[in-house]
Amino acid sequence: MDAEDGFDPTLLKKKKKKKTTFDLDAALGLEDDTKKEDPQDEASAEGGAAAEEDNLDLESFGKKKKKKKKPFNMDEIEAAIPSFGGDDVAASEEPEEEEINLDMDFSMAKKKKKSKKKELDELFADQADDDKSEDKENDEDNSSTWFGSDRDYTYDELLKRVFEIILDKNPDMAAGRKPKFVMRPPQVLRVGTKKTSFANFMDIAKTLHRLPKHLLDFLLAELGTSGSMDGNQQLIIKGRFQPKQIENVLRRYIKEYVTCHTCRSPETILQKDTRLFFLQCESCGSRCSVASIKSGFQAVTGKRAAIRAKTT
């Protein structure tokens, strides 16, 4: 068979090398390719096997087996390996880089947590400092509103400033309560048929913090009569008067000579300068002059006869 056909095993090797490719699909599908070979190749392979059996050479038999396994040649596989080996190496290196990146990320995350804690502490500290600075600025604004400003203030601003000072000096007014001046009602008694006794005159004068003489002059001038103090410190007034009349006179006296004309505070002092009286307020500090006491109309009854006699 070998002599007739003239097949050489070396030629078979060359033919197989020509048919083999570097493609893995071809390497994996060698079994299918061997099935699709020509019948002449199968016949030559059978002839070669017969010749090998005749020679009974173990070494050549072993070589023939290697020749059959030649499609799985290591040279071809090594030639194909580098194209895939580089990818495999790159693929193997990428997870290492990812692991390194992950480690770096974890470390950075830990640092960020620490930095967040520090940032929170710094934020709280900054907020506390800001609150303190704002409180100080508010205190400075309240204490020195006019400091460091040259502009002209509006009427509303000035009015607001005045009311703020009044509220600072009078905390009772901050709650919407005006200071009320409480005074005892006058005790008026009838003395005979033509005189009236003002029993608690001295007590009212002490309550108003005024001199009894000044109050007496105003009372007699407003009532248009005369009167004097007796031994029991009671005011005896000529004429018949009702308690309501005495109370109205006292109200006018308090409004004019006791309460402040600015803040209506009863905490005032009546001072005399030369011929004028000045009302000094201890609450708001205002100072204003008051009218002098003038005697009103007085009826002349006892002297009319003498006057008429002189004229006639």
Swiss-Prot record:
An example Gene Ontology biological process: translational initiation
Zinc fingers, C4-type class: 260-284
Acidic residues composition-biased segments: 90-102, 125-142
First-listed, main subcellular location of the protein, grouped into a coarse class: cytoplasm
The protein's name: Eukaryotic translation initiation factor 2 subunit 2
Sorted UniProt keywords: Cytoplasm, Initiation factor, Metal-binding, Phosphoprotein, Protein biosynthesis, Zinc, Zinc-finger
Described purpose of this protein according to its UniProt entry: Component of the eIF2 complex that functions in the early steps of protein synthesis by forming a ternary complex with GTP and initiator tRNA. This complex binds to a 40S ribosomal subunit, followed by mRNA binding to form a 43S pre-initiation complex (43S PIC). Junction of the 60S ribosomal subunit to form the 80S initiation complex is preceded by hydrolysis of the GTP bound to eIF2 and release of an eIF2-GDP binary complex. In order for eIF2 to recycle and catalyze another round of initiation, the GDP bound to eIF2 must exchange with GTP by way of a reaction catalyzed by eIF2B.
Compartments reported by the entry: Cytoplasm, Cytosol
Subunit details: Eukaryotic translation initiation factor 2 eIF2 is a heterotrimeric complex composed of an alpha, a beta and a gamma subunit.
Signal peptide (residue range): none
Phosphoserine PTM positions: S44, S133
Stored Pfam families: eIF-5_eIF-2B (PF01873)
Location of Phosphothreonine modifications: T145
A cellular component annotation (GO) from this entry: eukaryotic translation initiation factor 2 complex
InterPro entries: IF2/IF5 (IPR045196), Transl_init_fac_IF2/IF5_dom (IPR002735), Transl_init_fac_IF2/IF5_N (IPR016189), Transl_init_fac_IF2/IF5_Zn-bd (IPR016190)
Record family assignment: Belongs to the eIF-2-beta/eIF-5 family.
